């Protein structure tokens, strides 16, 4: 098993540019001067009243989530003084006076990703911003917190552990500094760089002892008992400004055909992937931070974004937080059972990597990797070339688009072969050989589906079935075979069809409410 970024995180969830307070805020989600007729934005696309019902994703949940996010945003804003006090305590910043003060920027300039709300905090001296920090809170309604209390803390513990692991084992990967973090119960931790000299020395000695004795990795974070409680988990991160780099997605369209820039990008991504996979892992799962002794251990379930999305949509939990795997078969078996349960519990069931998390300079040299959530120790077979290299998502990779991606895939793996000569791997796994074999055998499509919410619908027909049969009647054959999926299949399908009808009725009701509120 090797450490991998399992799935996409929050697109644009950190601040690349800070607008002046007089600038126009981010555009609203329910209106656009370029659209006509009733509708709304969903994941950057305009949906009409009619097309919303044809979406594979659950639009009812999306509307409810947006409303809940607005309430959570206001809840955080009402606690802005506490947020400023927490930042001040963790970083030992001076108290506000006539010249210095700490300001939480108004909500219209905050950034919301798929799973987090990012609050920008600015230190002002003489009316000018001198320091900027990102106070990031997980969204309770996106992390199944009401169904499974403690999931937000689980996410923070795993994300913090990813920072600690990379700080220790991959110092060549530039990531934002994690200054501090806190949990739901009010326990908070601060990086030892903010501690007095004597405590820093003592911590260094303890970490050395842990290494010598083979104990779990001791982090560089100490408990902080002076910071006020917020009432929600959080992480306090370094603000990464344009002087470090800009999101690759900002210049992607402009330079996508520049061979030299792409070569530098491929080299950079290869270095990151090889650095993360340099050390073999003992099991399939996630590292997690242990508040009792501030160590990290590989003792959490594989926390994939797909898992959280399904659990948040009322799919029963299949893998418990403390469950890890020693072999691929048992992990795969539980994941397939999880997909079965998702189908049974999704009322709308009868119907990935991201270039925004990479910061680059003008020449596309990678300068920083952001959003370390969803990093897992997964089977090496799941390692794959990023599907977005040709500006297409996995379900779009057919015909000429597939041929184009295959060409870029080969170029990417050639770049990785070159980088392998410069990376000291502590195992004898032939990474690029496995990645090439996964493509040839078409296993790559299967593993892509395992990490996805709904790619099964597209990739099976386009890529997996043709490996076994090309005859036109295979779809009918599969329908007949599906009757032995489990007992009472006909009744299950009829029930799902009734649920779909009720879903469409409720969706139209919600959409009318949305239009009336515009």
Task: List each language-model region with its residue ranges.
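Hydrophobic, Leu/Ile/Phe/Ala-enriched alpha-helical segments that form helix-helix packing faces
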Residues: 83-95, 162-170, 269-280, 416-420, ...
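ATP-binding pocket architecture of kinase catalytic cores
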Residues: 103-350
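Short loop/turn segments that connect beta-strands within the blades of beta-propeller domains
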Residues: 114, 362-363
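A structural signal for well-ordered alpha-helical scaffolds and beta->alpha junctions
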Residues: 80, 84, 156-160, 230, ...
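Intrinsically disordered, low-complexity intracellular terminal segments
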Residues: 195-224, 243-247, 252-255, 283-356, ...
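Juxta-kinase regulatory segment immediately upstream of eukaryotic protein kinase catalytic domains
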Residues: 2-108
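Conserved protein-kinase catalytic-loop segment immediately C-terminal to the catalytic Asp
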Residues: 357-361
């Amino acid at each position: 098993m090797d450490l991998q970024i399992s799935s996409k995180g929050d697109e644009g969830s950190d601040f690349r540019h800070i607008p002046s307070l007089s600038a126009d805020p981010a555009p609203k989600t329910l209106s656009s001067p370029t659209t006509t007729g009733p509708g709304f934005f969903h994941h950057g696309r305009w949906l009409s009243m009619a097309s919303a019902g044809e979406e594979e994703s659950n639009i009812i949940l999306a509307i409810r989530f947006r409303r809940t996010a607005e309430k959570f945003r206001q809840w955080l804003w009402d606690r802005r003084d506490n947020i400023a006090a927490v930042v001040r305590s963790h970083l030992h910043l001076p108290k506000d006076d006539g010249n210095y003060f700490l300001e939480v920027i108004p909500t219209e300039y905050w950034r919301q990703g798929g799973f987090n709300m990012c609050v920008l905090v600015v230190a002002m001296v003489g009316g000018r911003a001198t320091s900027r920090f990102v106070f990031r809170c997980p969204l309770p309604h996106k992390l199944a917190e009401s169904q499974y209390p403690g999931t937000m803390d689980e996410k923070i513990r795993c994300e913090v552990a990813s920072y600690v692991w990379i700080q220790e084992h991959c110092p060549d990967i530039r990531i934002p500094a994690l200054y501090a973090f806190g949990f739901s119960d009010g326990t908070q931790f601060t990086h030892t760089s903010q501690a007095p000299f004597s405590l820093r020395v003592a911590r260094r000695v303890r970490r050395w002892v842990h290494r010598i004795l083979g104990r779990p990795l001791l982090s560089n974070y100490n408990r902080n008992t002076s910071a006020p409680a917020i009432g929600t988990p959080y992480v306090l991160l370094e603000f990464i400004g344009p002087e470090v780099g800009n999101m690759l997605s900002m210049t992607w369209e402009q330079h996508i055909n520049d061979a030299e820039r792409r070569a530098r990008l491929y080299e950079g991504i290869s270095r990151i992937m090889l650095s993360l996979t340099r050390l073999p892992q003992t099991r399939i799962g996630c590292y997690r931070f242990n508040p009792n002794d501030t160590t990290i251990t590989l003792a959490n379930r594989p926390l994939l974004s797909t898992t959280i999305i399904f659990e948040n949509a009322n799919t029963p939990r299949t893998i418990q937080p403390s469950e890890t795997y020693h072999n691929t078969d048992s992990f795969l078996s539980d994941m397939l059972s999880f997909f079965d349960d998702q189908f049974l519990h999704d009322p709308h069931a009868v119907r990935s990597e991201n270039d925004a998390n990479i910061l680059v300079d003008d020449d596309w040299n990678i300068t920083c990797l952001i959003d370390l959530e969803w990093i897992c120790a997964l089977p090496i077979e799941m390692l794959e070339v990023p599907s977005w290299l040709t500006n297409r998502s996995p379900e779009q990779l057919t015909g000429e688009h597939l041929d184009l991606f295959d060409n870029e895939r080969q170029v990417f793996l050639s770049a990785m072969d070159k980088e392998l000569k410069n990376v000291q791997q502590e195992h004898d796994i032939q990474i690029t050989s496995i990645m090439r074999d996964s493509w040839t055998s078409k296993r790559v499509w299967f593993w892509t589906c395992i990490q996805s919410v709904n790619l099964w619908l597209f990739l099976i027909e386009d890529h997996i079935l043709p490996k076994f049969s090309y005859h036109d009647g295979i779809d009918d054959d599969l329908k007949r075979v599906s009757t032995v999926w489990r007992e009472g299949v006909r009744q299950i399908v009829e029930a799902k069809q009734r649920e779909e009808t009720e879903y469409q009725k409720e969706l139209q009701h919600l959409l009318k409410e949305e239009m009336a509120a515009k």
